[in-house]
Amino acid sequence: MVECLTGKKILIKGNYAIANAAVLAGCQCYFGYPITPQSEIGEFMSGKMQELGRSYVSAESELAAINMTIGACATGAKAMSSSSSCAIALMQEALSYAASDELPVVLISVMRGGPGLGNIYSSQGDYFQTTKGGGNGDYKLIALAPSTVQECVDLTYKAFYLAHKYKNPTVLLADGLLGQMMEPVEFKPYPYPEIDNSEWALTGAKGRKSRIIRSYAPLADEQCVFLEKLFNKYKQIEENETEWEEIGTEDADIVLVSFGSTFRNIKTAAKICRQKGLKVGVFRPITLYPFPHKRLNELADRVKKFISVEVNMGQMINDIKLSVDGKVPVELIHKPVGAPPAPEDIAAQVEELA
């Protein structure tokens, strides 16, 4: 069991770092079901939450876990679940309900290979699942993608903050490699203000009017009004919370784009390309939703080509193409599953595509 420490730097595995950060963010309830490669999160929470007098439930299924999380969030609690890929697929109906109910669910998704049962190797194959939504109807999940174990901590903090700020389900999307990787991490105190939920949380109606949280709108006009309200909120999220990182794009002819742990390799690949005389920059969406469409469109006015580097068969490339809007070509370098392509291999393919 990893001790929960604030203000100290320790060598720690990604999954333990995420769980540690959730506790420090004030997570009051955790509901989970074990699945590789994220089982260490539940392992950590099983001891630490009870030690702190908080709630931990090892649920009978993934469906039960996410619906328990919804119930806890309806009371205004900071509640979280975690799972992986094929098990996250089982949660899609509940996530649609959580978005419709406007509840601050935090979900940790540590990706493994697919489709179907797939395998336990690292993957980035759940980009579509997270950013396009597997549940019914018009809704969005805020999605944050760390590239280091330190960012697993920092973005777990942010996931709790954004979920409660916007009353919207928020996913920390980490590839399995990050979940199992060990790196030095500093656990700083939770940096965000606490959000007042007293106006909506179901905390008992004594002394006030009764409240109802629901996703059912029996009349078409009522549903139209609700969806307009929901998408006005998404517009605010897109305007205020879009986050990315870019390096060497000011003079680049080619920009490599990736998310998660793959970003580490494209940074090295870009340096190799620069040494060979190719002007290559790198770009990383930190928020997968909201996606940095506007910034990529601006870059497309002066670069000659984008190359998406992914550990899947090509998913984020579709959003890059949408962002670029046909101004320049968009190519793909990928591996279907496992560790990201090696920097030398990426650089060699960039030379071929240049």
Please identify what each model-predicted range represents:
Residues 167-246:
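Conformationally flexible catalytic loops at phosphate/diphosphate-handling active centers
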Residues 122-175, 342:
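Conserved thiamine diphosphate
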Residues 83, 106-110, 144-146, 171-175, ...:
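Short beta-strand segments
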Residues 13-17, 231-254, 267, 271:
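Glycine-/acidic-rich phosphate or pyrophosphate-binding loops and their flanking alpha/beta elements
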Residues 1-133, 140, 148, 336, ...:
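Thiamine diphosphate
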Residues 310-354:
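Peripheral docking tails and interdomain loops at the edges
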Residues 266-299:
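Generic long, charged, amphipathic alpha-helical segments
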